[in-house]
């Protein structure tokens, strides 16, 4: 896959010169992933029994069917039952970047090579993850929303399952610091200082965005719950657009956090 556009993500050529030294800019990558459940027939009979054991215990067939549907929806959340279908990445300062997305059929000629964000179709998940891990070492730090609890462990485990080399293994280190990983879901709750019901209880990204006057990534009528449906319908670009809106909102939220709350101990 062509990765020339990846180089535009890296800002190390934007340095300031002093009287006696050169200070390189700190490179910060903001990213988000979208996941889609693997088909049920991907799992053997024993695995399916394990996955739906909770539903199969229910005596009422209607309740059992409903519970099975709920469990199928939850499969998107786990790297052993789902795959990464999109990763959107932006440089926190320049807001240039890439959106890597799985697409069976996509016309790259539609893309504007001069655009600040390049949409890069990938044939499969392995190609997508390989492209991501080629970009990752170019950055000193990352910013996510709930990345410590979801995005990072998910891509670590999917990469391991597909034997894709992981180039940054320090994103799940010491929790109570913002480098190299600033997780805004942790920062805006002060590391869950007040639990689920206190003043710093956690809200979702949509709620935080609206509270701070940022356009919600869900404003266009698409959410993460739609990814399975969009994949089945071949609407790959719609997934990529939504994932990018998530990252753009995260960048805006990060800027507000850094200016107004950064440094609170």
Protein language model regions, located:
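Metal-dependent phosphoesterase core characteristic of DEDDh/y 3'-5' exonuclease domains
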Residues: 27, 82-120, 133-241, 245-249, ...
């Amino acid at each position: 896959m062509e990765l020339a556009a990846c180089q535009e993500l890296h800002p190390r050529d934007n340095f300031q010169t002093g009287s006696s030294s050169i200070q390189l800019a700190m490179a910060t990558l903001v990213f988000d992933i979208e996941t889609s459940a693997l088909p049920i027939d991907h799992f053997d009979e024993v695995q399916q029994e394990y996955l739906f054991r909770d539903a199969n215990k229910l005596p009422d067939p209607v309740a059992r069917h409903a519970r099975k549907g709920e469990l199928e929806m939850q499969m998107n959340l786990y790297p052993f039952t789902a795959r990464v279908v999109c990763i959107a990445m932006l440089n926190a300062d320049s807001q240039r970047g890439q959106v890597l997305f799985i697409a069976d059929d996509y016309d790259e000629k539609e893309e504007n090579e001069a655009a600040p964000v390049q949409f890069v179709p990938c044939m499969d998940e392995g190609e997508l993850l390989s492209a991501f891990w080629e970009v990752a070492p170019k950055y000193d730090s990352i910013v996510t929303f709930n990345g410590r609890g979801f995005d990072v462990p998910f891509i670590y485990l999917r990469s391991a399952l597909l034997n894709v080399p992981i180039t940054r293994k320090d994103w799940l280190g010491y929790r109570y610091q913002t480098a190299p990983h600033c997780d805004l879901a942790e920062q805006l709750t002060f590391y869950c200082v007040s639990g689920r019901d206190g003043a710093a209880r956690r809200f979702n990204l949509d709620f935080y965005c609206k509270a701070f006057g940022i356009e919600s990534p869900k404003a266009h009528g698409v959410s993460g719950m739609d990814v399975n449906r969009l994949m089945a319908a071949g609407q790959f670009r719609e997934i990529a657009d939504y994932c990018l809106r998530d990252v753009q909102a995260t960048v805006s939220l990060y800027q507000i956090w850094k200016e107004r709350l950064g440094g609170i101990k």
